[in-house]
Curated annotation (Swiss-Prot):
Its main location: cytoplasm. The lineage of its organism: Bacteria, Bacillati, Actinomycetota, Actinomycetes, Mycobacteriales. InterPro entries: P-loop_NTPase, PanK, PRK/URK. GO terms for molecular function: ATP binding; pantothenate kinase activity. It comes from Mycobacterium marinum (strain ATCC BAA-535 / M). This is Pantothenate kinase. One of its GO terms (cellular component) is cytoplasm. Keywords: ATP-binding, Coenzyme A biosynthesis, Cytoplasm, Kinase, Nucleotide-binding, Transferase.
Length: 312
């Protein structure tokens, strides 16, 4: 563990230092389960779960308990009835990072681990993809080329959803996005019923603004980080692999890429990266990294090697 030479709100760890903080946290995840959680191109193994995610699960367990004590203290000050222990105030975790950096896998593994704790068995995971405007609306606004940028999301609807969950509503509904069809599924809803923990995963969840934003409602946030050059290579590799998986489906919005030979597919992937994903990362996503409670820094082989925890 290292503290920066200048006064800083952060503590930095290498993986060896971080894994020591696991204490006796048990591993309740099998190799078969991990394979089901792993995203395309991801290399996470049980050793990384043990050394990185179990200490994180322990930290979050401690923070959930501390947050509930804080809510109870506020209720006591206000003279309000103590909260029902069976319906605590939901703990909200944000997971941010670039396309292809592995944030979805991070969120799924975290959900699986946290759901195994006795004190918070209901852990829901929602992605912000569902809050993208439908393609017809993006076309009307001339935003199809900006899909994934902050302005392509229905931020008011996202804010209403997270506020509803946080305030203890019996249920809240999120729209559902189809990566196959590259569009919102009309009428489809993901229903969230008063979770103990809600994980919200998306590109821009740590964005700030002149008014209240979803990041203001987070109790904890993660940023999955890596060198831009490494993320680009991961994106290209994933694009190539998807030609024989998701893109191969005739119903896929990107089916026309499935027959491209390697050289042409690489050119197509790098063009998408250069015109959409890299600008969004540099202009909108990367500037939110300092807001994260914990930054997970990956090496070129996808493994998490360093972590930075905000202590203040």
């Amino acid at each position: 563990m290292s503290r920066l030479s200048e006064p800083s709100p952060y503590v930095e760890f290498d993986r060896r230092q971080w894994r020591a903080l696991r204490m006796s946290t048990p591993l309740a995840l099998t190799e078969a389960e991990l394979i089901g959680l792993r995203g395309l191109g991801e290399q996470i193994d049980l050793l990384e779960v043990e050394e990185v995610f179990l200490p994180l699960a322990r930290l979050l367990h401690l923070q959930v308990a501390a947050r509930q004590r804080l809510f109870a203290a506020t209720a006591e000050f206000l003279g309000e009835p103590q909260q029902n222990p069976d319906r605590p105030v939901p703990f909200i975790i944000g997971v941010a990072g670039s396309v292809a950096v592995g944030k979805s896998t991070t969120a799924r593994v975290l959900q699986a681990l946290l759901a195994r704790w006795d004190h918070h068995p209901r852990v829901d995971l929602v992605t912000t993809d569902g809050f993208l405007y439908p393609n017809a609306e993006l076309e009307r606004r001339n935003l199809m080329h900006r899909k994934g940028f902050p302005e392509s999301y229905n931020r008011r609807a996202l804010m209403r959803f997270v506020t509803s969950v946080k305030s203890g509503s019996d249920y809240a509904c999120a729209p559902v996005y189809s990566h196959l069809h590259y569009n919102i599924i009309p009428g489809a809803k993901q229903v969230v019923r008063h979770p103990d923990i809600l994980i919200l995963e998306g590109l821009n969840v740590l964005q700030t603004g002149p008014t209240l934003m979803v990041s203001d409602l987070f109790d904890f946030s993660l940023y999955v980080d890596a060198r831009i050059e490494d993320i680009e290579q991961w994106y290209v590799s994933r694009f190539l692999a998807m030609r024989s998986t998701a893109f191969a489906n005739p119903e896929s919005h990107f089916h026309h890429y499935s027959a491209l030979p390697d050289p042409e597919a690489v050119v197509a992937a790098r063009e998408i990266w250069r015109t959409i994903n890299r600008p969004n990362l540099v202009e909108n996503i990367l500037p939110t990294r300092p807001r994260a409670t914990l930054v997970l820094r990956k090496d070129a082989d996808h493994s998490i090697k360093r972590l930075r925890l905000r202590k203040l």
